[in-house]
Amino acid sequence: MLKNNSVISINDLSDEDLNLIFNTADSMAGNLKNGSQIKTMSGRIMATLFFEPSTRTRLSFESAMQRLGGSVISMADSKSSSTAKGETLADTTRMVSSYSDIIVVRHPLEGAARLVQKFSSRPVINAGDGSGEHPTQTLVDLYTIKKSFGDINNLEISIIGDLRYGRTVHSLLLALSRYNVRINLVSPDLLRLPGHVMSRLKNIKINEYNDLNNVIESSDVFYVTRIQRERFTDKNDYNKVIGTYGITEKDTEKMKENAIIMHPLPRVDEISSSVDNTKNAKYFIQAANGIPVRMALISLILGD
């Protein structure tokens, strides 16, 4: 059950939870389309603690809470908070949980979201912890695939770019291992999927490639990620891999008729702007899906 529970990893959610979230997201999307007023979170407060830059995720969560009739208190810049004075994450968490009903946290250190959960008296949602996981982005990704194809099973899904540091990739692969799918991992050798993630992927067919051309004609889903410059400790390594892959409008001509291109955003040069108006481009729809999906998750955690 989701009620009053935290979501730190995608593995904190059962298959039944996923289906419930997607069905609830459909209802939320319908309400948004019809302009229906939702007040189920009236009187509830969400605290957003973002120790790392964010545009889509933070605004998506805050918009979702407000559209449910709730309110938001926000720390969008750790430099202006007491953490800049040396306050520990544990103490910050204790204080913020006394001000709110639910906490959404993003932090540059892997494992930080679990620490927040440990010291919080309220449910916690992980909005990204370093190169660890980003479970709500995975919910949005799965929902987008499901809405595009009607099902997630029996698809060939190619994940392209920074597989080493990309937390969206790690969460997505853990979730996809529950389905009957074929996975292609396309990356430079420097950015291959870490062994600790690969070892957790059971009963799933995975192929690894360096060349995008190996998968361009056969894939149903292209999940493209930016190279995470901020995670590199050696700038020379970053310079070796920047610009390795870039999908252009010409590439879409080689794809299946109904293939979709996704990206968790922000993008740099991984997808040309010429792709934006093609029928394959789904990344802006994917971003928009974040609102009903996060509305669904919040309402299921805090609902009566």
UniProtKB/Swiss-Prot annotation:
InterPro entries the record matches: Asp/Orn_carbamoyltranf_P-bd, Asp/Orn_carbamoylTrfase, Asp/Orn_carbamoylTrfase_sf, Asp_carbamoyltransf, Asp_carbamoyltransf_Asp/Orn-bd
Binding site for L-aspartate: 85, 167, 226
Record key words, sorted: Pyrimidine biosynthesis, Transferase
Uppermost EC category: transferase
Annotated binding of carbamoyl phosphate, by residue: 56-57, 106, 134, 137, 265-266
Pathway listed: Pyrimidine metabolism; UMP biosynthesis via de novo pathway; (S)-dihydroorotate from bicarbonate: step 2/3
UniProt-listed Enzyme Commission number(s): 2.1.3.2
Keyword Transferase tagged: yes
Gene Ontology molecular function: amino acid binding; aspartate carbamoyltransferase activity
Catalysis: reaction(s): carbamoyl phosphate + L-aspartate = N-carbamoyl-L-aspartate + phosphate + H(+)
Key word Membrane present: no
Signal peptide location: none
PROSITE patterns per record: CARBAMOYLTRANSFERASE
GO biological process, one term: amino acid metabolic process
A Pfam family hit: OTCace_N
HAMAP family linked to this entry: Asp_carb_tr
Subunit description: Heterooligomer of catalytic and regulatory chains.
PANTHER family named in the record: ASPARTATE CARBAMOYLTRANSFERASE, ORNITHINE CARBAMOYLTRANSFERASE, MITOCHONDRIAL
Functional description taken from the UniProt entry: Catalyzes the condensation of carbamoyl phosphate and aspartate to form carbamoyl aspartate and inorganic phosphate, the committed step in the de novo pyrimidine nucleotide biosynthesis pathway.
Family of the protein in this entry: Belongs to the aspartate/ornithine carbamoyltransferase superfamily. ATCase family.
Name recorded for this polypeptide: Aspartate carbamoyltransferase catalytic subunit
Organism lineage: Archaea, Methanobacteriati, Thermoplasmatota, Thermoplasmata, Thermoplasmatales
